[in-house]
């Protein structure tokens, strides 16, 4: 059977000029994969009315999506809390630009049926289905039969608050989870040999912590037939686990996020207020050197997830460590920076109550061993 090498990166925001430059540090790893997948965080449009239910992200230039193709990305997931920030026009312009650049997409569309439909990928004769769901709201971003938006899984907050990214989300709606599971089964029945589920989930800007719903929801995707589950949204790495022999990356952190929309020194009042308020809400002060990526200081540790399949069977799981250079550019990490990423992943897994990952450095990646019960320290 052919070998299938899948590499996944986290959130992508390419507001700044020269997007090829910002992606150049990770492009070699993306290009070398059989399939490379990322999460597109914001609409790429110059049109549309701002959504009022969340702090709206500005639309990025549609022509910047060509840089994703240049960097080697084959597909993007779209179901997230910002994809509808410029309304239906913003979604349509994003889909059009992705199509023009030959980038497959899933998770947002002009109605809910299209948003829930998988992106179909193929490499070496192996058919891969990619599905994408927003688990954090806002509800106004969710697609309906008559409204553009994203595919979603409803997660109810504590105390009946509105479903929104900053809410204390805890309780997955069984009907929503059932629809996701049916999507996975439908993809299998339609011929998917490998199925990947991407979940926009979790708590932003806080190290290690997983919301109560995150692990059960990822497990449900595997129970339905997913071979790989990837998470994003937190803008900081989350831990890893195997469930029934299938890898779950609970949060890939940032793939490449370079934007001035998170600066408190800007003219947009709600974005400037959010940039100030999030520091107070989440208890961190960004490193002033990271002017285009003012996230939690621990967000400098990143990774590209890598899973190798022998045909339809996963045979190796691991990651390529990333480091973010000021003002926010990701690069493949080596030496002490790579060691720091490995040690950080071990620590956040333990802090989140996940099994301690057993890491082995190989020529191809940092491999995560699935079935070891005792692991010697990888690094000093």
Report each predicted region and the residues it spans.
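Acidic, metal/ion-coordinating pockets
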Residues: 1-380
């Amino acid at each position: 059977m052919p070998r299938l090498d899948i590499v996944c990166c986290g959130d992508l925001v390419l507001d700044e000029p020269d997007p090829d430059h910002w992606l150049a540090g990770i492009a070699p790893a993306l290009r070398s994969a059989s399939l490379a997948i990322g999460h597109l965080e914001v609409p790429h449009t110059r049109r549309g009315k701002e959504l009022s239910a969340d702090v709206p992200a500005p639309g990025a230039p549609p022509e910047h999506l060509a840089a994703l193709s240049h960097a080697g990305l084959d597909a993007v997931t779209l179901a997230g809390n910002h994809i509808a920030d410029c309304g239906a026009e913003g979604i349509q312009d994003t889909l059009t630009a992705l199509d023009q650049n030959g980038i497959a997409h899933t998770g947002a569309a002009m109605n809910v049926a299209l948003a829930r439909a998988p992106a179909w990928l193929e490499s070496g004769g192996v058919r891969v289905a990619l599905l994408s769901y927003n688990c954090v709201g806002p509800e106004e971003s969710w697609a309906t039969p008559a409204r553009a938006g994203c595919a979603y899984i409803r997660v109810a907050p504590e105390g009946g608050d509105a479903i929104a990214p900053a809410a204390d989300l805890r309780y997955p709606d069984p009907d929503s989870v059932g629809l996701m599971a049916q999507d996975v089964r439908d993809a299998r029945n339609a011929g998917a040999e490998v199925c990947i589920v991407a979940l926009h989930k979790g708590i932003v800007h806080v190290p290690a912590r997983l919301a109560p719903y995150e692990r059960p929801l990822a497990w449900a995707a595997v129970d339905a037939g997913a071979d790989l589950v990837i998470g994003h949204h937190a803008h900081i790495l989350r831990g890893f686990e195997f469930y029934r022999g299938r890898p779950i990356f609970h949060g890939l952190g940032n793939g490449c996020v370079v934007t001035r929309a998170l600066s408190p020194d800007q003219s947009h009042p709600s974005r400037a207020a959010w940039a100030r308020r999030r520091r107070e809400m989440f208890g961190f002060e960004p490193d002033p050197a990271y002017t285009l990526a003012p996230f939690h200081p621990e967000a400098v540790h990143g990774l590209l997830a890598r899973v190798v399949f022998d045909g339809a069977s996963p045979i190796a799981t691991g990651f390529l460590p990333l480091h973010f250079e000021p003002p926010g550019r990701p690069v493949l990490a080596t030496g002490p920076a790579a060691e720091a990423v490995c040690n950080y992943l071990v620590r956040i897994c333990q802090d989140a109550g996940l099994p301690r990952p057993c890491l082995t450095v190989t020529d191809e990646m940092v491999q995560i061993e699935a079935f070891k019960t005792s692991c010697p320290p990888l690094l000093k």
